[in-house]
A protein has these predicted regions:
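The feature captures the beta-strand-to-loop junction immediately N-terminal to the Walker
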Residues: 33-35
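Conserved ABC ATPase signature
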Residues: 132-136, 140
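Conserved structural motif at the start of ABC-family nucleotide-binding domains
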Residues: 2-4, 17-19
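Helix-to-loop junction immediately C-terminal to a conserved catalytic motif
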Residues: 48
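Conserved ABC transporter NBD signature motif
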Residues: 56-64, 73
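Conserved ABC ATPase "signature" region
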Residues: 97, 110-128, 153, 158
Length: 252
């Protein structure tokens, strides 16, 4: 379980996060949703220890994030941010092997190579595994980055807007892969998602934020109602049942 207690953050006098406390359940996909400026990515940055907490605490299975040694954290938590600074002159296969670095420390084993090859297959990257990142489309590069994160083999995976640069087909395909791997490997995946239909279809748990606070949380079927979406986004929608999932239809 990820335990977040009394986390606040301000820029000047403006609250970005306002005393956020929540428990993210162990296992499955938890989607962080909400309008722009709700505080989702800021909360993500604290959960990923990309910036130091100003107040409150975050713990993974009871272990305080702030006190966890970096080497241990790299084998516990893997992250993908919106902005990634991985060098471009690297092949897809080498990028995925870079995700194994916390284990091989520059000397890849046969097990590391096997994990990389399996990830290339799972994320449909074999056809350009030896191409440089500069030679890939934005969507292909995004899939490669997420595959690298999963190669890290951590119990916790944090993804900030993983569907960036992906068309409808590849966004759905990626969410199906994430759901499959999360379940098979018994991982806990937390993803910031702007597409609430993807969250409704693939998340096991939803945390909805607004104005720096947790507005509501629970199962997708309980969160994605017309009334709740009106509260979150201040817009009218219809919520349909489609193939046992909620489908949110915007009024145009």
């Amino acid at each position: 379980m990820i335990t977040i207690r009394n986390v606040s953050y301000r820029i000047g006098t403006r609250p970005i996060l306002d005393n956020v406390s929540l428990d993210i359940p162990e296992g499955g996909i938890t989607a962080l949703v909400g309008p722009n400026g709700a505080g989702k990515s800021t909360l993500f940055s604290f959960m990923a220890r990309l910036r130091p907490l100003e107040s409150g605490s975050i713990a993974y299975r009871g272990k305080n994030l702030a006190c966890t040694p970096t080497a241990e954290l790299a084998r516990t938590l893997s992250i993908l941010t919106q902005e990634n600074s991985i060098m471009s002159r690297i092949t897809v296969r080498d990028l995925l092997m870079f995700g194994r670095y916390p284990y091989h420390q520059g000397r890849p084993s046969e097990n590391d190579k096997t994990i990389v090859e399996e990830a290339l297959a799972e994320f449909h990257l074999q056809d350009f595994s030896d191409r440089y990142l500069t030679e890939l489309s934005g969507g292909q590069r995004q899939r490669a980055m997420i595959a690298m994160v999963f190669c890290q083999s951590t119990d916790y995976v944090l993804l900030d807007e993983p569907l960036n640069n992906l068309d409808m087909y590849h966004a759905r395909s990626l969410m199906q892969i994430l759901q499959k791997l999360t379940r098979e490997h018994k991982r806990t995946t937390v993803a910031v998602l702007h597409d609430i239909n993807q969250a409704a279809a693939y998340a096991d748990h939803v945390v909805a934020m607004k104005n720096g606070k947790v507005a509501m949380q629970g199962k997708p079927d309980d969160i994605f109602t017309a009334a709740n979406i009106k509260t979150l986004f201040d817009m009218d929608v219809s919520v349909l049942d489609h193939q046992s999932k909620k489908l949110i239809v915007h009024h145009i």
